[in-house]
Amino acid sequence: MKVFHILWIITLGAGLWACSSASVFVQTDRVEVNSTISPDDTLQAFIAPYKKELASNMDRVIGFATDDILRDRPEGALGNFVIDETENYLKEDGWLEGKHYISIMNYGGLRAPISKGDITVGDIYRLMPFDNTVVLAKLPANELDTIIAYLKNSGGEPIGGFQIDGENFGLNKGVTLKDTLFVITTDYLANGGDNMNFFKRSYEITDTGIFLREALIKRVEALDTLRPLLDNRIKW
């Protein structure tokens, strides 16, 4: 009985301790980071080889541009390059076999032009600094009308697989409007980014796991020479 009494007291004490709140004292100091702070020599020495390796990779020449490749609206050579070479990469990788597809990216996602001359890995990173992946969205074919309305409202985005001329539109050879249509885009846009809400009505969305930036790097390496292309994809 005495042992039971002692155990009961220990259990009660543990319960009261668990229910009580503990105070923790935290002290912080505000450290302003500005140009007066000297680099840490040890840290600098540690990161130096990684920095050198990164710089070496970013400076690696992968192709040549015959002229500046710029973004523009309603159509720009930079957007056409991104669209066309994304499609070409997916074709080579077997993703588009037997599919009727179009493509749409976003003007705002093209962060830097490709300047005339040597093209480096760093140039493609500046163009595409985000880790966006390439996605195939399966949409009802009648959503093409919604996409065109979106393009009219935005003033134009990079597209492929169809053309717009005022109130009229046409599909590229080999593309037909059946019950469904595959749309090549990015994971960001497929999730409704830039208010592309028509993707929310997708039957299915397949993320290829291919980083858009890496696909473009490989395509530039394969092409070697880039020439700006404008082919009247959008005319208002």
Go through each PLM region and give its residues.
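Bacterial N-terminal signal peptides that target proteins for export
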Residues: M1-L7
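C-terminal motif of bacterial Sec signal peptides marking the signal peptidase cleavage site
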Residues: G15-A18
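Feature captures C-terminal
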Residues: S21-E32, N80-W236
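Generic structural signal for well-ordered, non-membrane alpha-helical segments
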Residues: L43, I47, E75, G79-I83, ...
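Anion-binding (especially nucleotide phosphate/pyrophosphate-binding) glycine-rich loop
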Residues: P49, E53-S56
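Acidic/histidine-rich, surface-exposed loop or edge segments in extracytoplasmic proteins
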Residues: S56-R73, M196-K200
